[in-house]
């Protein structure tokens, strides 16, 4: 499988916002992004970084993909998290996830994320989970780049 990555394109931000139901107003103006393009040139996934707090070293991310597309590869994960931890120099990545998305929560747990349950985050009947990944937890994971492991 051949994937290509594009950085900083507004098309990626629109793509991600359209695929996530709770992003009804888009993302803040000071966002960053990585788009994932397949061999035919079609955008199949995207990652948006927003609410970057440089002082505290935190950044929030949102990711979305077309259904049935294999995009969450080791290389994509490495690029996404190295961007946050190396380029942005963050010490923590934060992702909000619907409580019923057990598959994604399972994947994030395997990466070493810690979780905070947030009742009603997505409305009266829909809970959310704040998923927190520190640079130390990522550095301990085999998918991290050598740069991240050396810095930890």
Regions found by a protein language model. Give the residues of each.
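Conserved glycine-rich acetyl-CoA-binding loop
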Residues: 66-78
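Conserved acetyl-CoA binding element of GNAT-fold acetyltransferases
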Residues: 55-68, 96
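Short amphipathic alpha-helix that is part of the acyltransferase structural core
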Residues: 1-24
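Conserved active-site alpha-helix within GNAT-family acetyltransferase domains
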Residues: 100-117
């Amino acid at each position: 499988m051949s994937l290509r990555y594009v950085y900083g394109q507004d098309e990626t931000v629109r793509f991600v916002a359209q695929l996530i139901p709770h992003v009804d107003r888009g993302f803040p103006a000071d966002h960053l992004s990585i788009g994932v393009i397949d061999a035919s040139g079609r955008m199949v996934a995207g990652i948006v970084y927003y609410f970057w707090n440089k002082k505290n070293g935190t950044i929030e991310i949102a990711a979305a993909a077309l259904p049935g597309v294999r995009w969450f590869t080791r290389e994509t994960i490495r690029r996404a998290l190295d961007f946050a931890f190396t380029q942005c120099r963050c010490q923590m990545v934060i992702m909000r996830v619907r409580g019923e998305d057990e598959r994604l929560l399972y994947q994030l747990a395997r990466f070493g994320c810690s979780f905070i349950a947030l009742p009603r985050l997505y409305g009266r009947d829909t809970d959310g989970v704040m998923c927190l990944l520190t640079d130390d937890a990522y550095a301990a994971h085999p998918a991290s780049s050598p740069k991240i492991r050396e810095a930890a």
